[in-house]
From Swiss-Prot:
This is Beta-defensin 104A. InterPro entries: Beta_defensin_dom. Keywords: Antibiotic, Antimicrobial, Defensin, Disulfide bond, Secreted, Signal. It comes from the Eukaryota. Its main location: secreted. One of its GO terms (cellular component) is extracellular region. Disulfide bonds join C30-C57, C37-C51, C41-C58. Belongs to the beta-defensin family. Residues 1-22 form the signal peptide. It is found in: Secreted. One of its GO terms (biological process) is defense response to bacterium. The lineage of its organism: Eukaryota, Metazoa, Chordata, Craniata, Vertebrata. It comes from Pongo pygmaeus (Bornean orangutan). Has antimicrobial activity.
Amino acid sequence: MRRLVLLLAISLLLYQDLPVRSEFELDRICGYGTARCRKKCRSQEYRIGRCPNTYACCLRKWDESLLNRTKP
């Protein structure tokens, strides 16, 4: 009976998504200073690679109309 309780407790601990890294490493700057390290990129961000802490390097999407502006 003890083994069953022990196995249940261990499986519950392993099932949880325990943070391996500190919370300070979540919003680190990556991508030559233009992006952020996140567990998952937000809906308005592109994933451009991986951070040293194995999280995704997320770059904010930009409005293409701002890039193609021409002065009259």
